[in-house]
């Protein structure tokens, strides 16, 4: 029934003189999106002392399912970006670009450390590319260069992820021309933005517990707080509040550019679920003191963040509904801003991605 309503909504949009492609009809190739942009060069991962300390590397360094690579970014002065690539079992398979949240691998808060993404996606015979850098960057192109521990030098992540990397990596893994992009928390916003800025490039988008809006006062403050954690400012990233660059990087304002892309969008309510409780954490093996502190923090801090995300995401749904743009929504009655729910999203979004890839 959900799928039928989505089809009917899309059909209604096409009743006018012009009609955009049905959802999932990605048409552009990496070469078309790249234009004249210089391409990334791939090489085996150089294991620096910093990388060697990151849990994801220790966890998967001997796992043949995960190829450890680095890709240069010409737009970021040749910076070498570490990549974890979950390889499909076969050639000519789709590619998912999976983005970490604010702290990323740099803070040991990434998909490979904290989820079963490798087991899950390997079983689906799909390629997954995870950039293991980009903490606090929103994976966008910044207007000025910050100089902090996590953010130093040119930050041209959109250029890297959409123009420099796809041609190189998809050629290397012998992928087909189907692709999706997904992210959680900070990068849930990024996944929507990169799809909007490159219409027709992604078959599907997964936005797990993020906020589409960035150029409204309250939502912009949330962006500012996130970037501040990385030692930079939102003004360094997108210029002054309400500037053309800020508005360009507001997925709510530019929602029309998501038409024709399969969408999976989720949030919890902010109310504690079973995964946020003391007893759940004790059952997972944490000692009582750690479990008590963790559950209290999740229910207070994580609950407040997710309540804001829930408000923002319902506003986004209203905007998409008004425009007749179909999406698959997962609004949970409970759930804080935390990993158990993003791991569930990784799996719950797969039917949406699979449907898009099979068109």
Label each region the model flagged.
Residues 2-10, 14-359:
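Non-catalytic cap/lid and distal C-terminal segments of serine-dependent acyl enzymes
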């Amino acid at each position: 029934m959900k799928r039928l309503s989505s089809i009917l909504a899309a059909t209604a949009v096409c009743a006018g003189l012009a009609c955009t492609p049905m959802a999932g009809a990605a048409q552009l190739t990496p070469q078309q999106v790249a234009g004249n942009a210089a391409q990334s060069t791939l090489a085996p991962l150089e294991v620096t002392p910093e990388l060697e300390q990151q849990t994801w590397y220790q966890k998967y360094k001997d796992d043949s399912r995960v190829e450890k690579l680095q890709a240069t970014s010409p737009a970021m002065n040749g910076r070498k970006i570490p990549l974890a690539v979950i390889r499909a079992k076969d050639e000519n398979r789709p590619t998912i670009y999976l983005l970490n949240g604010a702290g990323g691998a740099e803070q040991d808060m990434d998909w490979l450390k904290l989820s079963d993404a490798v087991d899950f996606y390997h079983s689906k015979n799909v390629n997954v590319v995870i950039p293991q850098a980009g903490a606090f960057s929103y994976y966008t192109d910044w207007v000025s260069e910050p100089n902090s521990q996590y953010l130093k030098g040119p930050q041209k992540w959109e250029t890297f992820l959409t123009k420099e990397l796809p041609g190189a990596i998809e050629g290397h893994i012998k992928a087909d021309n189907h692709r999706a992009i997904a992210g959680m928390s900070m990068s849930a916003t990024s996944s929507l933005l990169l799809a909007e800025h490159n219409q027709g490039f992604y078959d599907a988008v997964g936005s797990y517990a993020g906020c589409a809006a960035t150029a409204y006062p309250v939502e912009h403050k949330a962006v500012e707080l996130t970037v501040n954690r990385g030692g930079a400012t939102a003004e360094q990233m997108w210029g002054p509040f309400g500037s053309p660059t800020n508005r360009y990087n507001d997925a709510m304002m530019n929602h029309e550019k998501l038409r024709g892309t399969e969408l999976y969008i989720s949030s919890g309510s902010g109310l504690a679920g079973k995964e946020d409780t003391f007893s759940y954490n004790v059952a997972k093996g944490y000692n009582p003191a750690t479990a008590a502190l963790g559950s209290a923090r999740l229910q207070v801090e994580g609950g407040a963040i997710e309540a804001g995300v829930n408000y923002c995401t319902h506003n986004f749904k209203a905007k998409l509904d008004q425009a007749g743009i179909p999406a698959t929504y997962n609004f949970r009655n409970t759930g804080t801003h935390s990993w158990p729910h993003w791991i569930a999203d990784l799996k719950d979004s797969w039917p949406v991605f699979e449907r898009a890839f099979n068109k």
